[in-house]
Amino acid sequence: MTYWVWSLTASLSRDSVAPALSLQQQEKAVLAAPALPPSLQPVLAGVDPSEQLLKTLLEVPLDRLDDRQRLLLAALTRDQAERVAALALPLETQDLEPLQRALATAEPSTTLSDAHEQLLQNPALDPLLRQLSCEALGGSRDRCTNPEDADAAVGASQRLLLAQLFPIGALLIGVVLLLRDLWMRWRRALPAWPPLLGPLLSPVEITILVAGGFVLLGGVVLPVLVSPVIEVLFLGQPGGLGQAIGVLLSYITMAIPPLVILRSQLGALPDDNVPDGGWLQWRLQPWGRALLQGGRGWLMVMPPVVFTGWLMGRLVGDPGGSNPLLEMVLRSDNPLALVLLALTAVVLAPLFEEVVFRGVVLPVLARALGRGWGVFLSGLVFAVAHLSIGELPPLLVLGMGLALLRLSTGRLLPCVVMHACWNAATFLNLILLGS
């Protein structure tokens, strides 16, 4: 308990991914604007996406902006003091230093000099930075629009469109399904839930599983022993690959102790009491129905989770403490790194967490305290285990939704599918808006 309280408190000092995500979305909007139909531009990119990007950049402390973002700020702003401040910090990327000097010494002009035009051919400049810097150095909008960058604008418009329409569409479908389910439940038109079967463990045994295996051994002891080795072996890999390998190996290391303890606990139970489908009630067949149940559960849980996150933002703002993996995905441009991060988030995390929280914790607590308390407490433990106080309320709602799916289907596989769908949707959105 002390470890979780300390970790939750410490999560407040971690940066939130929200500002970085907002910046990426605004950058995509500026780049995509020329390729969007005029009727869609105000909806997808805003009336003045460049002004919105500048506003978003100014909301982030300069020391949290990377080299490229500070140059974007200097190129966009018309305030000399803001430009000087943005260009004052030294750059870590040497290839961008000529552009930094050009923006720092540029005088107000209506023409782009030949020297500046040559400077903008630097391959280190991406299409958006090249275009905005060109305009800041005196080039006209037409002259600064590079035909070779047209494909980048079209690609950005497609990613922006998908990143906005996909969650909105899923949210609307979820609202319809949720209202339909509530209506049918009120009319008593839904079938009764099956009996809740699970391991015949005691609350003390699941405390040993979670506190001893998950927290102490998996969260404290093994990371202290393994993390230095992982860091030495893989941290120097390019493009975030070392971080992705570290995340994957760290997650596997964290999962091993509780799974070993769980196997020992289940092995000690009498064989003649094992229910059909096993202690964890995987019930893999029919797998097609499990996919449908999991996908439907994901759509139905989205409205309450999104509403909870929105309400938290309105009441307390953004407290920070996002999962560091989110920003890794957002900034990574290494395909193999993204594959490893996806394997961790979309495959390993749903499998391990559903085994522990919906396969064991929920049935034991529901048998000891009743289904209502079992749903709430298993969801609370699930939320706290993510060690992010800012994301705790939405994760609590998500955990309760997963618990209700386990109760309504009597199977664990749909919960894994639902959890994987949630993580995959988040992952996809980050890739669409990321590097």
Predicted regions and their residues:
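Juxtamembrane helix-loop-helix connectors linking adjacent transmembrane helices
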Residues: 18-19, 193, 224-251, 264-348
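Functionally important transmembrane alpha-helices
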Residues: 372-435
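Short juxtamembrane and helix-loop transition motifs at transmembrane-helix boundaries
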Residues: 336-339, 351-361, 377-384
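Short, amphipathic, aromatic/basic-enriched membrane-interface segments that mark the entry/exit
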Residues: 347-348, 361-369, 384-389
